[in-house]
Amino acid sequence: MAPKRKPPARAAAAKLDPDGMFRGVSAFVVPHAVQSRRLEVWKQRLAQMGGRVQEKLAAKGGGGAVTHVLAADAKALLRELDAAWLHRFRGSVVSFEWLEECLKSGERLPEHKFAINYEEEFKPKKEGGAAGSGVLQSAKRSKISSDGPENRKETAGGNRESRDAIAHPNEDSDVVKGPSTCTSSQSASGDSKETIASQNAFKAEEASSGESSTYAPPDLNRNITEIFGKLINIYRALGDDRRSFSYYKAIPVIEKLPFKIESADQVKDLPAIGKSLKDHINEIVNTGKLSKLEHFENDEKVRTVSLFGEVWGVGPATALKLYDKGHRTLDDLQKDDSLTSAQRIGLKFFDDIKQRIPRHEVSEMEKLLQEVGTDILPGVIIVCGGSYRRGKSSCGDMDIIITHPDGESHVGFLPKFVQRLKGINFLREDLIFSIHSIEGTDCGVDTYFGLCTYPGRELRHRIDLKVYPRNRHAFGLLAWTGNDVLNRRLRILADSKGYILDDTGLYLATPGSGGKRGGRSDAIINCDTEKDVFDTLGFPWLEPHERNL
């Protein structure tokens, strides 16, 4: 019997077209903010139609054989590649939308329409952006706040999940991994060489909470911003930080408009309002609702995971696990023995924590904190940051930034402060408590996260206390004031200038390989005030109430 002949390989051969529309394209594909399966399909299609996919970049810039860099957006791009390298790159830097549209149309489209303008990430805009929220990676790691951290959630031990911090779209993009390389909390900028005059100037500038400059936008389009706000929470709970952040950026832009939106054409040229959001606005204006939101609200899984994600300390991964266990309500969670003590506290006071705090009450509590702190340590500086310092009429929580001008007396202050505040029934439940100033670890920054009560009431509010050494205080104050958009722009700008910026300092970046970001040096750039940080980076100075970008 004659052996069977193998079928001709015509089908396989037909899939490869070296003269296809992507001939001459040698692409490096940034894998962030896109599903891996979708990414593989795009790579296959690109290769089938004459293109090539490069897995590595040349280390010295120029991209080697690479002609195109493809990414989801500027944020994903700058997570993978150094801004300085991109400036040297002479090829095309485009979004995946270019590839998608080429495949849809069957022809290679002009690339300039899909170019990623990563420089816009750190350029100031008159209108645009949004507040977001920052988070501690752990009780023993430094936080890079991305805004006024109003929505951060931590696990009891401080181990952060891929959680809902818009300020931290992805954990490896915003948190310095590995052991802390920070030096001791003592420095020349905070020791006895500092004059009384400079200490007084420091107090005058940094102690201002922005009380006299409130942020009161017209807010004539609540029908739109309230829907966008719900989508923020849903996408955050689902771990889709990219989409969550896009709605987050749009809200302040819409809030500031001096007119009622009656047509989507009125917003087509506004920053942070792309085609998708414009379509949403058009639907809301014409129908009074948004089908996407209704779809989410009618989906049991999305609805439940979103609900669980609102519990303090529960991130997207944990929320999904709880759903997969069969839990559907907050009452169900009460019976789950896998919850940490901090998560149980978040669950117990779920309704309390969700209530916003009126500005005048925050002001009174800030004064109380200053009085108690001064009684323990004369000269201590205590400022409430976040949306309060930016002038908002209410706050989701209180972010308290603390230091002492002499650069030394802050050491060991936080335990005494917490004990005194518990003694007067101001601080009630503990979530995270870590002390590093005594040993000089983790840049000497001490942290307390917990719940507090307004005097005479039992309603719980979230409060964070951060004590910084004098030489790191400006960075902490800047980071914990926010907002998210400003902090992201400053970090990207710092990166483009060869620095790494976080809430503990501005550091010289160490070189990486293949165009990728390296680590950071031990040395901190001296900046006594927030303005010094702005000036060092070459970014226009913004008063706290001007930072609602």
Swiss-Prot record:
User: Which residue positions are annotated as catalytic?
Assistant: 280
Which Enzyme Commission numbers does its entry carry?
2.7.7.7, 4.2.99.-
Enumerate the SUPFAM superfamilies for this protein: BRCT domain, DNA polymerase beta, N-terminal domain-like, Nucleotidyltransferase, PsbU/PolX domain-like
- Renumbered to this chain, region (DNA-binding) spans 233-247, 315-318, 438-479
Where does this protein have compositionally biased stretches of type Basic and acidic residues? 149-175
Gene Ontology terms, MF aspect: 5'-deoxyribose-5-phosphate lyase activity; DNA binding; DNA-directed DNA polymerase activity; manganese ion binding
Primary location recorded for the protein, binned into one broad class = nucleus
Question: What is this enzyme's catalytic activity, as reactions?
Answer: DNA(n) + a 2'-deoxyribonucleoside 5'-triphosphate = DNA(n+1) + diphosphate
Describe, from its UniProt entry, the tissues in which this protein is expressed.
Answer: Expressed in proliferating tissues. Expressed in roots, root apex, young leaves, shoot apical meristem (SAM), flag leaves and panicles.
- What GO biological process terms are annotated to this protein in UniProt? base-excision repair, AP site formation via deaminated base removal; DNA replication; double-strand break repair via nonhomologous end joining; nucleotide-excision repair; response to UV-B
Q: Where is the signal peptide?
A: none
Stimuli inducing this protein: By UV treatment and methyl methanesulfonate (MMS).
Q: Where is the composition biased (Polar residues)?
A: 180-197
Segments carrying the region annotation (Disordered) are 126-197
Q: Which residues form the BRCT domain?
A: 17-116
What exactly does this protein do? Repair polymerase involved in base excision repair (BER) and responsible for repair of lesions that give rise to abasic (AP) sites in DNA. Has both DNA polymerase and terminal transferase activities. Has a 5'-deoxyribose-5-phosphate lyase (dRP lyase) activity.
Q: What name appears for this protein in its UniProt entry?
A: DNA polymerase lambda
Q: Which organism is the protein's source?
A: Oryza sativa subsp. japonica (Rice)
Organism lineage string: Eukaryota, Viridiplantae, Streptophyta, Embryophyta, Tracheophyta
